Swiss-Prot record:
Compositionally biased residues, Low complexity: 245-261
Family label: Belongs to the universal ribosomal protein uS2 family.
Annotated compartments: Cytoplasm
Annotated segments matching region Disordered: 214-261
Pfam families: Ribosomal_S2
Organism: Debaryomyces hansenii (strain ATCC 36239 / CBS 767 / BCRC 21394 / JCM 1990 / NBRC 0083 / IGC 2968) (Yeast)
SUPFAM superfamilies the UniProt entry points to: Ribosomal protein S2
Domain of life: Eukaryota
Biased composition regions of type Acidic residues, renumbered to the chain: 222-244
Matching CDD domains: RPS2 (cd01425)
UniProt entry tagged with the keyword Nucleotide-binding: no
Alphabetic keyword roster: Acetylation, Cytoplasm, Ribonucleoprotein, Ribosomal protein
UniProt protein name: Small ribosomal subunit protein uS2
Length: 261
C-alpha cells in the first residue's frame, strides 16, 4: 500500500517501534501473515516489517476517524497488558472500551444490560478476544486487530502486524493509532505538532508495584520529617520561668521560720 508523503514513517516513530520490540514476532507463522515477515532470525524469531506495520496503523486510524460518532467504535482487550491502553485510547478518542472479560452476548443478545451495537470493533489479540470477533461476524461488524505472526485471521478485516504479547509493544501501537486518529480529526493541528501525551501512559502497570512504590514513598517522607520535628522541639522550645524563691516556700517551712526558737 502506497501512502502520501505526509504519512511516511518518520525516524522518530521507527525508533519507538524498535525500542518497544514491536518488530519481534512469534516463531510460528500463520499463512496469511507471511507477507508481513521481514526475515527470520537464527533463533527462529520472525522479524516483522515495521514499514507495513505503520501502513496498517494509518489505515486503521483512517477507518476509525471515518465513523461520525466516536462512541460507535468498540475497543476490546481481554489480555491484561492491553486493558490500560484500551481505556486510555477510549478516553482520548471517545470510543467505547471493553476491558477485561468479554461478556458473551454483548453484540448479539439485546436482552443483556451490556448490549452494544458498534459500527467497528478493534481488538488487542484475535486469540484472546475470539468471542468479540465471533459475535462481530454474526452481526456484520468490521474488525481491526493487532495480530502477531501466529494469530488467526478469520473474520479480521484489517490486521496490524506487531508483537501483541509485550506490554510496551501493545501500549505503543494503541498510542500511535490514537495519535493518528486525533490528527485526522484535526484535534492535533498538523503532523509536525507533537502530541502532549507520552506513550508511557498507555503501558501496563502492575498494581502491586504501584502500591509498593507508594508505600516506600510514604516511609521515606516519614523518615525525613521525623528528625526535623525533633530538632525544632530541641532548639526552639521555650522553657518555663520558675520563681525559685516562691516555689521553695511551703506552709510548714513558713510556720517554722516564724516561731520563737
Amino acid at each position: 500500500m502506497s501512502l502520501p508523503g505526509s504519512f511516511d514513517l518518520t525516524p522518530e516513530d521507527a525508533k519507538l517501534l524498535l525500542a518497544a520490540n514491536v518488530h519481534l514476532g512469534s516463531k510460528n507463522v500463520q499463512v496469511h501473515n507471511k507477507p508481513y515477515v521481514y526475515k527470520t532470525r537464527p533463533d527462529g524469531v520472525n522479524v516483522i516489517n515495521v514499514g507495513k506495520t505503520w501502513e496498517k496503523i494509518v489505515l486503521a486510524a483512517r477507518i476509525i476517524a471515518a465513523i461520525p460518532n466516536a462512541a460507535d467504535v468498540a475497543v476490546c482487550s481481554t489480555r491484561t497488558f492491553g486493558q490500560r491502553a484500551v481505556l486510555k485510547f477510549a478516553a482520548h478518542t471517545g470510543a467505547t472500551p471493553i476491558a477485561g472479560r468479554f461478556t458473551p452476548g454483548n453484540f448479539t443478545n439485546y436482552i443483556t444490560r451490556s448490549f452494544k451495537e458498534p459500527r467497528l470493533v478493534v481488538v488487542t489479540d484475535p486469540r484472546t478476544d475470539f468471542q468479540a470477533i465471533k459475535e462481530s461476524s454474526y452481526v456484520n461488524i468490521p474488525v481491526i486487530a493487532l495480530t502477531d505472526m501466529d494469530s488467526p485471521s478469520e473474520y479480521v478485516d484489517v490486521a496490524i502486524p506487531c508483537n501483541n504479547k509485550g506490554k510496551h509493544s501493545i501500549g505503543l501501537i494503541w498510542w500511535l493509532v490514537a495519535r493518528e486518529v486525533l490528527r485526522l480529526r484535526g484535534i492535533i493541528p498538523d503532523r509536525t505538532t507533537e502530541w502532549s501525551v507520552m506513550p508511557d501512559l498507555y503501558f501496563y502497570r502492575d498494581p502491586e508495584e504501584i502500591e509498593q512504590n507508594a508505600t516506600e514513598d510514604i516511609k521515606t517522607d516519614d523518615v525525613e520529617e521525623a528528625p526535623a520535628a525533633d530538632a525544632e522541639t530541641e532548639w526552639t522550645g521555650e522553657t518555663e520561668e520558675v520563681d525559685w524563691a516562691e516555689s521553695g516556700a511551703t506552709p510548714a517551712a513558713e510556720e517554722a521560720a516564724a516561731s520563737n526558737w
